Amino acid sequence: MASKVLPQALLVIPSNHSLQCPPLKKQLGFPIDSNRRFSLSSNCRSNLMVSRASSNLFSSNFSSIFSFPARNSFVVRSEAEDSSDAPAESVAVVAEEELPVESEAEAEERPPRQQRVKLGDIMGILNKKAVHAAEELRPVPGIRTGDIVQIRLEVPENKRRLSVYKGIVISRQNAGIHTTIRIRRIIAGVGVEIVFPLYSPNIKEIKVVSHRKVRKARLYYLRDKLPRLSTFK
C-alpha cells in the first residue's frame, strides 16, 4: 500500500530540469560548501528522475489495470445492445400479431354469463306456472270489487255435493295462486261474509252475474250501512 501511495506523493514535485533543491542554509542554520551543494543537487535530480520513472510505471500499471476491463465492458454492452435490437423488434411484432387472435379465441370460448335468479323471482315464476295450470283446468273470469258473483263449491265434508253461494265482492287480495275474494250477503237479516280461494280445486264454477262500478277497492263500509245496500236480485 505504501509503494502505491509514494509515487502519488512524488508526482507533486515539478519536473523542471533546471530546478535545484532549495538552499539548506536557512533550514539547517549553517553554511554548506559548493561540493556538498552539488552533491545535493545531483541527489535531488536523481530523486526527480526516480519519481518520474515511478510515476510513469504507476500510471502505466494503473491504466493497464483499470482501462482494460472498461474497454471490454463497453464492447460487451455494445454487442448486447446490437444483438438485442433485432430480436426485440421481432418479438414485439409477434406479440402484436398474437394478441388479437388470443382475444378472439377467448371471446368465442367464453359462454354467456347467466343472470342470478333471486328467491322472489323464483316464487313469482312458480306462481305464474301454477296459475296457468289452474286456468287451463277451469277458466277464471275477470272479477272486480262490486261485482255480483255466483260460485258453485264442492264440499268434501258433505259427500262432495255442490253448494251455491251468491253475493257481492267487497274485496280482492291478489297473491298469485293464493288469490282470494271476499263475498258478502244478507241471510235472515244478518250480514255474512265468506272468503273463497279463487284458484281452489273445490270451486267448480264461478259466474259473474252483474258488474257494478264502485269508487273504492274495498267495500268494508257496507258493514255499517243498512242491509238493503248489500242485497241484490
Swiss-Prot record:
For this entry, list what GO says about its biological process: translation
The organelle targeting sequence, given as a residue range: 1-77
Cellular component annotations (GO), alphabetically ordered: chloroplast; ribonucleoprotein complex; ribosome
UniProt KW Ribosomal protein keyword: yes
Q: Provide the GO MF annotations for this entry.
A: rRNA binding; structural constituent of ribosome
Q: Which InterPro entries match?
A: Ribosomal_bL19, Ribosomal_bL19_sf, Translation_prot_SH3-like_sf
Task: Write the lineage as a comma-separated list.
Answer: Eukaryota, Viridiplantae, Streptophyta, Embryophyta, Tracheophyta
Q: What protein family is recorded?
A: Belongs to the bacterial ribosomal protein bL19 family.
What is the species listed in this Swiss-Prot or TrEMBL entry?
Spinacia oleracea (Spinach)
What NCBIfam families does the record tag this protein with?
rplS_bact
This chain's protein is named Large ribosomal subunit protein bL19c
